[in-house]
Design a protein with these regions (language model features):
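Secretory targeting and sorting signals
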Residues: 1-36
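Alpha-helical transmembrane segments and their juxtamembrane interfaces
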Residues: 14-15, 123, 161, 293
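N-terminal carbohydrate-binding accessory modules
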Residues: 33-111, 124, 357
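Extracellular glycoside hydrolase catalytic/binding regions
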Residues: 57, 61-64, 87, 92, ...
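Acidic active-site catalytic centers that drive phospho-/nucleotidyl reactions
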Residues: 72, 151, 283
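Short, histidine-centered active-site or binding-site loop motifs used for metal coordination
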Residues: 84, 118, 152-156, 190-192, ...
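Aromatic-lined substrate-binding rim segments of carbohydrate-active enzymes
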Residues: 96-157, 164-169, 212-214, 296-310
Length: 361
């Protein structure tokens, strides 16, 4: 086991626990404490910790799907933990060298999801610009040894086929340009909604070969019905995907949740699905489904305990200074050059702690 980028006192303590046979992996708990104690403040101008010798990509290499889990080059089950950007048409200023150094070397993240909205003043307005921005972020994440999820953030219209030709153009360009890298994951449909699983499946079976033609080895993430809820938000269940999977290999299915809105029914569906099909939580928050309002840390912790137990990777929404409670930074942080813990909202401090939990690579 490689404990990546962990302060020496933590590594020693963990080694001591292992030597006594004590369990250190988190398990699903129904008695999690809901409160969050803010981390000690780091001054605004304090530099991020220096890079360590082993990055997530160095430790794991090219990822692949093995059975119902994500595996590294050595065939070991791995869980990635990290953050999602907000829409890059609105918050590109939140992704710079300083913020990514903080994410990589202070938060100890493994992955960032690059959210390219299609509509809402996104990709469709300037395909060349947004494609170049994705490639720029991939370069920046690669320099820090992080994995990059290329998220085609379709949302409204909810039928992914509406943007099929745009998606083909986008993924061809990005995959062709980055096909020599071993740290790229493709998410081909953010939150399909208002259409059947069969319609979504048809889209996936058209777009997956487009990615495969340029990048045959990358893991591809597939959105599920009803805002990637496995159909639960439409009154269905995971069985529609389990019993009728996409005809493709090396793929995983996505699940999104917002803890203050999505309770036991959603958690149970995720748990059942993860035993049958490969799952990846590409978006979640501790707030309501709009990413705002009060935090429900207790319910969020139950989800993350399950994810740790079943090695389900996740990225949290979102790495920005948006006014909503789901953005990790306080307003005015991005572009300031200062991303210390005193710039974090309550949810930001909580998710930083979750990401900093030592990896089991």
């Amino acid at each position: 086991m490689v404990l990546r980028r962990v302060p020496i006192i933590v590594a020693v303590a963990t080694a001591a626990l292992l030597s006594t046979g004590a369990a250190v992996a988190p398990t699903l708990s129904t008695t999690t404490v809901a409160t969050h104690e803010a981390p000690a403040a780091v001054p605004d101008d304090a530099p991020a910790a220096a890079p360590q010798a082993i990055t997530p990509v160095e430790a794991n290499g090219q990822l692949s799907v093995c059975g119902v889990r994500l595996c590294n080059e050595q065939g070991k089950h791995v869980q990635l933990r990290g953050m999602s950007t907000h829409g890059t048409q609105w918050y590109s200023q939140c992704v710079d060298d300083t913020s990514l150094d903080t994410l990589a070397y202070d938060w100890n993240a493994d992955v960032m999801r690059i959210s390219t909205y299609v509509q809402e003043d996104g990709y469709e307005t300037d395909p060349a610009r947004f494609t170049a921005l994705v490639n720029q972020y991939i370069d920046m994440l690669s320099e820090r040894g992080l994995y990059a999820i290329v998220d085609w953030h379709m949302l409204d219209p909810g039928d992914p086929n509406f943007n099929l030709e745009r998606a083909k153009t986008f993924f061809t360009a990005v995959a062709e340009r980055n096909n020599g890298r071993n740290n790229i994951i493709y998410e081909v449909a953010n939150e399909p909604n208002g259409v059947s699983w069969q319609t979504i499946k048809s889209y996936h079976e058209q777009i997956v070969p487009v990615v495969r033609a340029k990048d045959p080895d990358a893991v591809i993430l597939l959105g599920t019905r009803a805002w990637s809820s496995l159909g639960v938000s439409d009154g269905a269940s995971e069985s529609e995907v389990v019993n009728n999977p996409v005809n493709a290999s090396n793929v995983m299915y996505t699940f999104h949740f917002y803890a203050a809105s999505h309770g036991q029914e959603y958690l149970d569906a995720l748990s059942r699905a993860a035993d049958r099909i490969p799952m990846f939580i590409t978006e979640f928050g501790t707030q309501d489904y709009a990413g705002e309002g009060a935090n429900d840390f207790a319910m969020a912790q139950r989800y993350l305990d399950l994810a740790a137990q079943k090695k389900i990777s996740w990225t949290n929404w979102n790495f920005s200074d948006d006014h909503r409670s789901g953005a990790v930074f306080t307003e005015g942080t991005c572009g300031s050059g200062s991303y210390g813990t005193d710039r974090l909202k309550e949810a930001g401090g909580w998710i930083r702690d979750q990401i900093r939990t030592p990896d089991d690579f």
